[in-house]
Amino acid sequence: MTDPLLKCTTRHIRIFTAITQNNNLIEDSDHLTMDLDPDNEFLWENQAIEKVQNRFSELVESQVGQELSDYVLRKIGSDLESYIRQMLQAGEVSYNPDSRVLNYSMGLPRTPELL
């Protein structure tokens, strides 16, 4: 019997025990795949994307040798959400004004008028 697909879905991060092939998810219990900001709520520079990918790799590597569970995936997802919030507050990413819905899920934008 194969292991079931594990996944974690937060507001801005989706993590799956799978690999991508031709834009399809293929179950693979030996790999984790992250989908960053699937709703395009933020504007991302390549450097910011790389920072999140590197943080994801660090969090995954810290779990090597541990049993992979829903809890572990949720913890990684929550840690990445916090990391994105820090990046938003530092101005490394910004809200996408062309997003389908502007709900400011991580707080109002920090602008001189609001400070």
Swiss-Prot record:
GO molecular function terms attached to this record: oxidoreductase activity, acting on NAD(P)H, quinone or similar compound as acceptor; quinone binding
GO cellular component terms given for this protein: plasma membrane-derived thylakoid membrane
InterPro entries, A to Z: NdhM
Catalytic activity entry: a plastoquinone + NADH + (n+1) H(+)(in) = a plastoquinol + NAD(+) + n H(+)(out); a plastoquinone + NADPH + (n+1) H(+)(in) = a plastoquinol + NADP(+) + n H(+)(out)
Membrane topology summary: Peripheral membrane protein
Transmembrane segments: none
EC numbers for this chain: 7.1.1.-
UniProtKB keywords: Membrane, NAD, NADP, Plastoquinone, Quinone, Thylakoid, Translocase, Transport
Keyword Transport assigned: yes
Subcellular location: Cellular thylakoid membrane
HAMAP family listed in its UniProt record: NDH1_NDH1M
Protein function: NDH-1 shuttles electrons from an unknown electron donor, via FMN and iron-sulfur (Fe-S) centers, to quinones in the respiratory and/or the photosynthetic chain. The immediate electron acceptor for the enzyme in this species is believed to be plastoquinone. Couples the redox reaction to proton translocation, and thus conserves the redox energy in a proton gradient. Cyanobacterial NDH-1 also plays a role in inorganic carbon-concentration.
Subunit (UniProt): NDH-1 can be composed of about 15 different subunits; different subcomplexes with different compositions have been identified which probably have different functions.
Record family assignment: Belongs to the complex I NdhM subunit family.
PANTHER family in UniProt: NAD(P)H-QUINONE OXIDOREDUCTASE SUBUNIT M, CHLOROPLASTIC (PTHR36900:SF1)
Name this polypeptide is given: NAD(P)H-quinone oxidoreductase subunit M
Gene: ndhM
